[in-house]
Design a protein with these regions (language model features):
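N-terminal glycine-rich FAD/FM-binding segment characteristic of electron-transfer flavoproteins
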Residues: 1-160
């Protein structure tokens, strides 16, 4: 059973496509394993949780409307500590880099970057990452909890 947390991204009051890509993939993995999909929403975007249709649960973090990397990372650390998701999906974006690394370090959870595909495998996950501008694919398998930094455009945003 894979319980998944999707860390949403927004800009100027709009959720970014990467959010819906991750939600769709998270829902697919959760359904295939009998797990659940949660979305984490920040600041005033908590008023737009109706857009998180693929999520079974929406978790809100009151961190203000202006992006603050330290506050966002602290909020994610708190939610991960409280909920112990098996997979934390974060966009492989500038915001994702700000958040994933401190969470990974503080909670001792491995991170796989530039993920173009993720599948549940046994008690963990197998990720395919694109490297060198897509010229090389690297397959990584991780047992246990994982932070996956998802490459934008890897999944269909319409499914999320």
């Amino acid at each position: 059973m894979a319980n998944i947390l999707v860390v949403t991204e927004h800009l100027k009051g709009e959720f970014q496509d990467i959010t819906f890509e991750m939600l769709g993939k998270a829902k697919e993995i959760a359904q295939s394993t009998g797990g659940s999909c949660s979305a984490m929403v920040f600041g005033s975007m908590s008023g737009q949780t109706d857009q998180m249709g693929a999520a079974d649960t929406v978790i809100t973090a009151e961190v203000g409307d202006d992006y603050n990397p330290e506050a966002y990372a602290a909020a994610v650390k708190s939610v991960v500590s409280a909920n112990s998701p098996d997979l934390i999906m974060i966009g492989s974006t500038s915001m994702g880099i700000d958040i994933a690394n401190p969470v990974s370090t503080a909670l001792d959870i491995p991170t796989v970057s530039f993920c173009a595909d993720i599948v549940a495998a046994g008690g963990g996950f197998t990720c395919t990452s694109q490297m060198y501008g897509g010229k090389m694919n690297v397959v990584s398998s991780v047992d246990g909890a994982l932070i996956s930094m998802v490459l934008a455009g890897s999944f269909n945003a319409d499914t999320g």
